[in-house]
């Protein structure tokens, strides 16, 4: 293993000089002797000098310190030993529960599966959230994006999906916290303990591995932590489960993909690259592709991923969310307008889409009900301007009916969440897809036109709406 010395330090960027015939390769991990600091090679500048990004704080480092080339990229522990543990970007434990006992370590830089190895799935993944199951259904082994500005509920929606899917789905999950709040990571860990997904008595019985690179960490950590989490998920997908003899079906949760892009922007600027549109790095599409192409399903197992995507200034045309759109099978768009009406989850039923919304995949009935709901909501959206100027009285009877039904649909798309019980006091509801389709089919057919729209708000199934309406009727009498 070759060794060199630090010749320049600018924040998180360090230049290291090696002998000309021992220059490290791009992405090689270097260890600063006598410290915990790991560096990753980003550029070869010539004359034996490489430019690196520090995976951690550079406090206390100085010029002429000795650096050793590890001879390979950053590697992280993989396998059953990672379950129930919280690790950093380098796979080091940060939960104060002792070392991670793993038999293998995998490099975080890996080739994406070849076209021949990939497999398609049209099997639906039921989430128990009405608006998602009806209008933007998820595929097993698919990629889902939760798009939204600040404070519209991306993390809460993701937590509910973890609660509904990961707890019912018997497989394993990996959670990558990329540049998010430490408080949220802490809350998530304790929620997983309460739910029994993390078993601190016997980690081998746990169902989730957690990798965190939070907001307060240097850009190198935030840029690579998504790859560390993905590598752990790939191991479960690609290695045979002793019980079944084939790869596992894994859930990968990434919160937040925008922070991954932002860390790339910071690193790009530190490396002296010329910025591109809106100040983003010129390699934005390539970096996003390198990550997303690896999140896929193969013949041996599947990775179903749910990714939260922050939308800066609520602008979906911003280069970062716009680049992410191209890679996803389903997009759940969270709207500030809907959140301001108190309707949660604040999913925009007209903007959210899914490739699975096809009669050949989900069946004629589901497809027709979903399109019927969207048709009513779209017509209501068009009528809003007329109502604002002339009032409801100027509408035809047919249009009035559309408005009343649309308002009921809007409210019925809201739902109390299990993870929000502590804040709202309302018990969470899991609504099976079969019930969701039947309920909305009846609403657009006019079967519940006589019920007040308040009864539809924050209800689970349609039976609950009917019971609420009866209660309101008796209390008014």
Swiss-Prot record:
Key word Disulfide bond present: no
Catalytic activity: ATP + H2O + 4 H(+)(in) = ADP + phosphate + 5 H(+)(out)
Xref: CDD domains: ATP-synt_F1_beta_C (cd18110), ATP-synt_F1_beta_N (cd18115), F1-ATPase_beta_CD (cd01133)
GO cellular component terms, semicolon-separated: plasma membrane; proton-transporting ATP synthase complex
Annotated ATP binding sites: 148-155
Domain of life: Bacteria
Location within or outside the cell: Cell inner membrane
One MF annotation (Gene Ontology) recorded for this entry: proton-transporting ATP synthase activity, rotational mechanism
EC number: 7.1.2.2
InterPro entries: AAA+_ATPase, ATP-synt_VA_C, ATP_synth_F1_bsu, ATPase_a/bsu_AS, ATPase_alpha/beta_chains, ATPase_F1/V1/A1_a/bsu_N, ATPase_F1/V1/A1_a/bsu_N_sf, ATPase_F1/V1/A1_a/bsu_nucl-bd
Membrane topology according to the record: Peripheral membrane protein
Top EC class of this enzyme: translocase
Sorted UniProt keywords: ATP synthesis, ATP-binding, Cell inner membrane, Cell membrane, CF(1), Hydrogen ion transport, Ion transport, Membrane, Nucleotide-binding, Translocase, Transport
Family matches, as Gene3D superfamilies: 2.40.10.170, Bovine Mitochondrial F1-atpase, Atp Synthase Beta Chain, Chain D, domain 3, P-loop containing nucleotide triphosphate hydrolases
Similarity field: Belongs to the ATPase alpha/beta chains family.
HAMAP family: ATP_synth_beta_bact (MF_01347)
Subunit (UniProt): F-type ATPases have 2 components, CF(1) - the catalytic core - and CF(0) - the membrane proton channel. CF(1) has five subunits: alpha(3), beta(3), gamma(1), delta(1), epsilon(1). CF(0) has three main subunits: a(1), b(2) and c(9-12). The alpha and beta chains form an alternating ring which encloses part of the gamma chain. CF(1) is attached to CF(0) by a central stalk formed by the gamma and epsilon chains, while a peripheral stalk is formed by the delta and b chains.
Described purpose of this protein according to its UniProt entry: Produces ATP from ADP in the presence of a proton gradient across the membrane. The catalytic sites are hosted primarily by the beta subunits.
Designated name of the protein: ATP synthase subunit beta
Source organism of the structure: Psychrobacter arcticus (strain DSM 17307 / VKM B-2377 / 273-4)
């Amino acid at each position: 293993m070759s060794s060199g010395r630090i010749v320049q330090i600018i924040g998180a960027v360090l230049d290291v000089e090696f002998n000309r015939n021992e220059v490290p390769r791009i992405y090689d991990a270097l260890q600063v002797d006598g410290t915990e600091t790991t560096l990753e090679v980003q550029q070869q500048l010539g004359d034996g000098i490489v430019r690196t990004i520090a995976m951690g704080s550079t406090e206390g480092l100085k010029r002429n310190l000795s650096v050793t080339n590890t001879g390979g990229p950053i590697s992280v522990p993989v396998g059953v030993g990672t379950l129930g543990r919280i690790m950093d970007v380098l796979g080091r434990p940060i939960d104060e529960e002792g070392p991670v006992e793993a038999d293998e370590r995998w490099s975080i830089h890996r080739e994406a599966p070849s076209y021949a190895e990939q497999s398609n799935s049209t099997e639906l993944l039921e989430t128990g959230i009405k608006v998602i199951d009806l209008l933007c259904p998820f595929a097993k082994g698919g990629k889902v994006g939760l798009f939204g500005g600040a404070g519209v509920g991306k993390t809460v929606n993701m937590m509910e999906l973890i609660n509904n899917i990961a707890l019912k789905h018997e497989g394993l999950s990996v959670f990558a916290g990329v540049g998010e709040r430490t408080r949220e990571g802490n809350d998530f860990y304790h929620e997983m303990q309460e739910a029994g997904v993390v078993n601190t008595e016997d980690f081998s019985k746990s169902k989730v591995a957690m990798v965190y690179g939070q907001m307060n960490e240097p850009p190198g950590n935030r840029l690579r932590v998504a790859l560390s989490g993905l590598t752990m998920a790939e191991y479960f997908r690609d290695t045979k489960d002793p019980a079944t003899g084939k790869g596992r079906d894994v859930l990968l949760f990434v919160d937040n993909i925008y922070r991954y892009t932002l860390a790339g922007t910071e690193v790009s600027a530190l490396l002296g690259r010329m910025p591109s549109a809106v100040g983003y790095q010129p390699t934005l599409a390539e970096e996003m592709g390198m990550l997303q192409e690896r999140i896929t399903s193969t013949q041996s197992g599947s990775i179903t991923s749910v990714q939260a995507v922050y939308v800066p200034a609520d602008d979906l045309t911003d280069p970062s969310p716009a680049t992410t759109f191209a890679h996803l099978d389903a997009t759940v768009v969270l709207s500030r307008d809907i959140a301001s009406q108190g309707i949660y989850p604040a999913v925009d039923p007209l903007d959210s889409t899914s490739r699975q919304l096809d009669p050949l995949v989900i069946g004629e009935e589901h497809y027709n009900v979903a399109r019927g709901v969207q048709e009513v909501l779209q017509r209501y959206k068009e009528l809003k301007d007329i109502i604002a100027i002339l009032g409801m009285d100027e509408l035809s009877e047919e249009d009035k009916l559309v408005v009343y039904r649309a308002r009921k649909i809007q409210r019925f798309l809201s739902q109390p969440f299990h993870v929000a019980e502590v804040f709202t006091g309302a018990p969470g509801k899991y609504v099976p897809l079969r019930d969701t389709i039947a309920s909305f089919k009846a609403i657009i057919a006019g079967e519940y036109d006589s019920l007040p729209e308040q009864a539809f708000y924050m209800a689970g199934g349609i039976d609950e709406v009917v019971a609420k309406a009866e209660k309101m009727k008796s209390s008014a009498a």
